[in-house]
Amino acid sequence: MDPKLEERARELRTLLQKASIAYYVHDAPILEDSVYDRLYRELQELERAYPELVTPDSPTQRVGEKPAEHFPTVFHRIPLYSLENAFNPEELEEWQERLLRVLGRAPVPDSRTEGELEYVCELKIDGAALALTYIEGLLERGATRGDGQAGEDITPNVRAIRSIPLRLATADPPPVLEVRGEVYLALAEFERINQERRSAGDPPFANPRNCAAGTLRQLDSRVVAARKLSFFAYALHWPEGWPAGDPPQTQWQCLQQLKELGFPVNPLSQVCRGLGEVIQFYERWRGAQLPYASDGVVVKLNSLRLQEEAGFTQKFPRWAIALKYPAQEVPTRIRAIVASVGRTGAVTPVAELEPVPLAGTLVSRASLHNADRLRELDVHIGDTAIVRKAGEIIPEVVGILKELRPADAVPYSLPSQCPECHTPLVRPPGEAVTRCPNPECPAKLRGQLQHWASRDALDIEGLGEKRAAQLVESLGVRTVADLYRLTPEQLQGLEGMGSRSSQKLVQAIQRSRQQPWERVLYGLGIPHVGVVTAQILAGHFPTPELLAQASAETIAQIYGIGAEVAEAVVAWFAEPAHRRLLQELQALGIPALPQQENPAVSQILAGKKFVITGTLPTLSRQQAKAWIESRGGKVTASVSRQTDYVVVGSDPGSKLEQAQQLGIPLLTEAELLALDPTVESGDLHP
């Protein structure tokens, strides 16, 4: 190989990469399009003639020649959380009050003008979330958000997005770097694509978000390249010890770091001091003409240390919220009203509508919430209703145009009997919801089976809405325990179930016997007990018996569990039917428990804050974190004056030096375990 050809290929790659960063990141092109295209073709011809010159980060390698057959599922090392929504400044202020309580700070006298907290405001782009992983500076993987825990590996399509760098713009890349951001479609490009689809006789896309999300899942990356998706980065996760010197301490510094690495960052982002400046930012951009679709403002606590202290709920980071623009409202006619029964027996009136486009989707159903709301609105079948869709919530009826009410409009009120099982409905004292009290109501049974089989519970593949209905209606399944008595022969009698599919479903059901207690607890569907709450409760009460015997006062004292949850748990276990169900499940070996049951773990570390640095002798970092948190402690990512202990292993990072400077006590792994005198030698279980 001629060294001059190698050098020329390297020069072309470097120049084209710099040109892409200048164009997409800094909005300051250094090459005319025609010049870029000519240089690109020169590199392409060189690589075609000499394939050994091709490198993974070459601009020519963005688009593959062969369509993918499928997208494999990948698990996110760091979950992608959703954002809590606020729909007006008042809800934003309520969020800040909750945040201040979590951080242990005094309320702000005038939260709009004298806020002591500093925030970063970023426009909320209406697109699709993307998780990028770089290994030694090269793009290794791009994945969709999915359910936040697992998504689809769409790396070939990610490589086709010109604004996403294939190589980080740094001479000192970390071993692993994760970047999060939003893929979106510029409005002009969206219009061009839809015009092409109309000309071809294809239906147009409803909105840019749907088009962007659908494009990401195209099996042919050439289609992705042709649609010219764009990307804004907004978060990164880096390993300890990188970058050299001072790592980012704030969200704003993270955004600047992303730009330095070659990622496009929305230039309209801004640091705001207090909610007053946040609301000014929101008002400035609400209704503004932008080159992309935006449905609100994302407000993030600027300090990464305070973000760490605030932590997460089951679904959201406590330190961030989306302040959404006012919801879109449209009028349409109510064709009928039906009463829908959920798994807890809650009866919700639902309006069936003349289909109407709303917020990019075709809406044909909308919630009327409850009996009080029905009376307040004075809803009639045949009325013209005002329907609103705010964010990702289901559409709701917010008003009735009574002046348009036809003469034959029919008043509606909730039935007195359950529409599914005809049991008289009840309204518990103090509740707005009307419920069906029948434990054998088919609608409740269907919902309970679906919840039990859901991914975060027992994770039974193949047991969805349709199959749950068949099991209840055709096979007489009445409790989740009945699932474990089903045979392939019984299932083969159901519509759509053959020999193979019946065998697979029975195997999936039987495999779920091995799921741990925390998943079973979540699957029981106890009110207010979500995934995270179930994990906390299972950590403190390692068997169903221990939890069933606990008082509301005992449960409420656990860090992260409040009185409302505690009372709901005690009330659930007090029901004879629920106790019988647990006995049935335990007779079936559910949940799978260790041979020797652990006693309830003490809370000896309650209120203490720990930082872990280096590699511990026997515990992984995750195991050490779980051990500390199960005893009431909290593990944070950075050392501060509020840190009580730093646990030090081999090859510690800069946190050790920081702890020594601040005079914070240092612990070995053995000294950490010795903090709990109830732990016997060799017992390292959380």
Swiss-Prot record:
- Cofactors required: Mg(2+); Mn(2+)
Q: Which UniProt keywords apply?
A: DNA damage, DNA repair, DNA replication, Ligase, Magnesium, Manganese, Metal-binding, NAD, Zinc
Domain (BRCT): give its ranges: 600-686
Which reaction equations make up its catalytic activity? NAD(+) + (deoxyribonucleotide)n-3'-hydroxyl + 5'-phospho-(deoxyribonucleotide)m = (deoxyribonucleotide)n+m + AMP + beta-nicotinamide D-nucleotide
Q: Which residues form a coiled coil?
A: none
GO terms of biological process kind = DNA repair; DNA replication
| Catalytic residues of the enzyme | K124 (n6-amp-lysine intermediate)
The residues that the entry says bind Zn(2+) are C418, C421, C436, C441
An example Gene Ontology CC term for this record: cytosol
The record ties this protein, via InterPro entries, to:
BRCT_dom, BRCT_dom_sf, DisA/LigA_HHH, DNA_ligase, DNA_ligase_AS, DNA_ligase_CS, DNAligase_adenylation, DNAligase_N
Specify which residues bind NAD(+) according to the UniProt entry for this protein.
Answer: D33, S34, V35, Y36, D37, S82, L83, E122, R145, E182, K300, K324
Highest taxon above the source species: Bacteria
Q: Which Pfam families match?
A: BRCT, DNA_ligase_aden, DNA_ligase_OB, DNA_ligase_ZBD, HHH_2, HHH_5, Nlig-Ia
Q: Which GO terms describe its molecular function?
A: DNA binding; DNA ligase (NAD+) activity; metal ion binding
Is the keyword Endoplasmic reticulum in the record? no
Recorded hits in CDD domains, A to Z, give: BRCT_DNA_ligase_like (cd17748), LIGANc (cd00114)
Which SMART domains does this entry report, sorted A to Z?
BRCT, HhH1, LIGANc
**Mind telling me which Gene3D superfamilies this protein's record contains?**
5' to 3' exonuclease, C-terminal subdomain (1.10.150.20), 6.20.10.30, BRCT domain (3.40.50.10190), DNA ligase/mRNA capping enzyme (3.30.470.30), Helix hairpin bin (1.10.287.610), Nucleic acid-binding proteins (2.40.50.140)
Enzyme Commission number(s): 6.5.1.2
Q: Which PANTHER family match?
A: CHROMOSOME TRANSMISSION FIDELITY FACTOR 18, DNA LIGASE
Question: Which family, according to UniProt?
Answer: Belongs to the NAD-dependent DNA ligase family. LigA subfamily.
Q: What does this protein do?
A: DNA ligase that catalyzes the formation of phosphodiester linkages between 5'-phosphoryl and 3'-hydroxyl groups in double-stranded DNA using NAD as a coenzyme and as the energy source for the reaction. It is essential for DNA replication and repair of damaged DNA.
UniProt protein name: DNA ligase
Taxonomic source organism: Synechococcus sp. (strain JA-2-3B'a(2-13)) (Cyanobacteria bacterium Yellowstone B-Prime)
What gene name is listed for this protein?
A: ligA
